[in-house]
Amino acid sequence: RLWHSDIKYGPYLPIGVNGIKQQVYLVTFVDDATRFVLHGEFYPTLDQIIVEDCFRKAIQKYGVPETVYFDNGKQYRTKWMGRTCSKLGIRLLFAKPYSPESTGKIERFNRVVDAFLSEAALEKPQTLDKLNELFNVWLDECYLNKPHSALGDNNKVSPENAYRSDHKALKFLDSDRITNAFLHCEARKVDKAGCISFDGHKYEVGIAFVGSTVDVVYDPADL
């Protein structure tokens, strides 16, 4: 199984400080052979964490793929993505720079999403949860269960049916192994009070470690 992923710039929602409108971003993971969307979600920030979160949720639902294929965006080409794929036994590939045809399948899906964004604009969602709720309904009713022009001899097969008809066994892993694969690690120096600073907070390590450098291992989805 080969998965693609991409980030699409979404609408502005009043979710910033004091209701200021803030742009949100859609991350999707799509099965190459069937065009089935394994997971898609709008997020409030544009960073590597949103890709990792979406990837983890896709894996939890559908197991691990043999290969993932990404563009060269900085949210994908990170040491943590490399570590995750290595830990889970996933082959990690990147598209050649300046070759949009290599990510054409998911780019075509992103153009289909434009129809959803037009519909969502009429609903005027005020929260990220509401936007994601609308997206999931649209995904089920207007994409996953609709005939896809690239599937089947008569172009009458939907991504949902194509994926469910693929009898290749899904590979599920223990939840602890998945959690471990997505952990991050950063070095911090212990100050004179025996504390370290991390993610805007102070944590006591102990006087015995003053001047030492310690590794902070953490789950970015649980900060």
Regions found by a protein language model. Name each.
Residues 124-155:
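A conserved active-site cap/scaffold subdomain adjacent to cofactor or substrate pockets
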Residues 1-28, 34-37, 48-57, 61-66, ...:
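Mobile-element integrase/transposase regions
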Residues 6, 35, 55, 68-71, ...:
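Mobile genetic element proteins and their domesticated derivatives, centered on retroelements
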Residues 68-72, 76-88, 92-117, 129-132, ...:
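RNase H-like two-metal-ion nuclease catalytic core shared by retroviral integrases
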Residues 33, 59-63, 89-92, 113, ...:
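A generic secondary-structure signal for well-formed alpha-helical elements
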